[in-house]
Regions:
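Short, glycine/serine-rich, charged loops/turns that create anion-binding
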Residues: 57, 121-123
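A short His-aromatic
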Residues: 94-95
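A short acidic, helix-capping loop that chelates divalent metal ions and anchors anionic groups
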Residues: 123-130
Length: 175
């Protein structure tokens, strides 16, 4: 997809500043669904220790070496190390609904806290290529509940209508 002319690489990097405000001092971060790697690189530039995870290297604009791990979220590789924070933007809505709880459980097993940005509307690009790219379109309350199964404190930071910014603190680890 990233090689298709006109395809948007996603909004991940635009959320780095907001997420960094919650993350604070340099720490360990896993960028779940890193896409181009722009957000991961931005966190590295801020001094964070970052691992980038995605189902494909195709969209990467940076060479993360062994800091890139090819993996799906619902079958998260054992090679993904633990980290203090997760960062997951424009990813969860792309999963089939039945994979969402599984992926969240796997993610909560790797990080203590996670910043999410999730779209609550159908994607605009999919119809151009005859595909549905946002497979899980749900209201903010649904996302808060499903994330809340895996994290102790879940907060809706911002609901701009189509996009929900969610902070998840304290992974329960048992899921």
């Amino acid at each position: 997809m990233h090689q298709v002319p006109g395809y948007s690489p996603g909004p991940g990097v635009s959320h780095v500043s907001s997420a960094a405000g919650y993350i604070g001092q340099p720490t360990s971060i896993i960028d779940f669904g890193c896409g181009t790697g722009d957000a991961a690189q931005a966190f590295i530039s801020l001094g964070h220790d970052v691992f980038a995870v995605d189902i494909s290297r195709n969209g990467l604009r940076y060479d993360f070496g062994d800091r890139f791990i090819k993996s799906s979220l619902h079958e998260l590789s054992d090679a993904v190390p633990g980290a203090e924070w997760g960062f997951c933007c424009d990813v969860m809505e792309h999963l089939p609904t039945e994979w969402v709880p599984v992926a969240l459980g796997k993610m909560a097993g790797k990080v203590i806290n996670c910043y999410f940005s999730i779209s609550g509307v159908p994607d605009s690009w999919g119809p151009r290529i005859g595909e549905t790219l946002h497979l899980t379109i749900k209201p903010a309350a649904w996302w808060l509940a499903v994330i809340g199964v895996h994290f102790r404190d879940v907060r809706l930071l911002h609901d701009s209508g189509p996009v929900y910014e969610i902070l998840a603190i304290g992974a329960t680890r048992g899921n």
